[in-house]
Amino acid sequence: MSGNYRHRLPLNALRAFEASARHLSFTRAGLELNVTQAAVSQQVRLLEEQLGLELFIRLPRGLALTDEGLALLPVLSRSFDQIESLLQQFEDGHYHEVLSVSVVGTFAVGWLLPRLPAFAALYPYIDLRIMTHNNVVNLAAEGVDFAIRFGEGLWPLAENTALFSAAHTVLCSEKVANKLTHPLDLKDHSLMRSYRKDEWEKWQIAAELEPWRVKGPIFDSSRLMVEAALLTDGVALAPSCMFEHELSAGTLVQPFDISVTLGGYWLSRLKSRPTTPAMAIFRHWLLAEVQK
């Protein structure tokens, strides 16, 4: 067998060999392929003749692979698995595509998750996989298609598209809010902090206060910070747009109409990553949702 023979590949014989090699039995291969044992044996023999070598050692009971058979089996098995996996992605007349998105946890719970049912209804053939992070994500190492994160959009080697800015304001329970009549009253309460060191100072300046040193636990998630504030009668400085449900329900209260913008939410992808159809669809859908 020589030259360009792709158009002459003995696919039936290759299938017969691959099944027989996995089972080390022509009989069990025939059951899998829904043909007779004799038909499988004949196909394997034809393949051996075409290759000019033996792929099996015929034993009194069963089969054993020759060195050539051992070399051929993993290549065929991998190829058939890939073909099967790809064909499964064409179910329902659509190409089913996996889309992986790494999302900062606060954005995932406060904004994205409530909207995902609508996305799934529009694009059932996109297998969306959501992974949460706390703003530290390596697009190259994690192999995700997109990351949604908070900051100023200055991440290198990435195409960063602004979604919306996020004004941070004081959030707490109604019990704590009843004790806050002036921003200076915050000095008497535990103030939760994030990894952004100057956020409380910026809010104090916006409130026309002389900044004071804030001491309190540090969190890497605004969602976790707010939960901690509710559990410990503390006060959080967090993006109110991510807690609209809790504010509407009265679980959270915004005691002061003072806010400060510390950054925004961004959609990021590696510049070197080719855009797939699913990526283009998700980006278009996400930006449309942001505009609503």
Curated annotation (Swiss-Prot):
Cellular compartment(s): Cytoplasm
A GO biological process held by the record: DNA-templated transcription
Record's keyword terms, sorted: Activator, Cytoplasm, DNA-binding, Transcription, Transcription regulation
Main localization (coarse): cytoplasm
One MF term in the entry's GO annotations: DNA-binding transcription factor activity
Gene Ontology cellular-component terms listed: cytoplasm
Residue ranges occupied by any HTH lysR-type domain in the UniProt entry: 9-66
UniProt similarity note: Belongs to the LysR transcriptional regulatory family.
Protein name: HTH-type transcriptional activator AmpR
Lineage per the UniProt record: Bacteria, Pseudomonadati, Pseudomonadota, Gammaproteobacteria, Enterobacterales
Gene: ampR
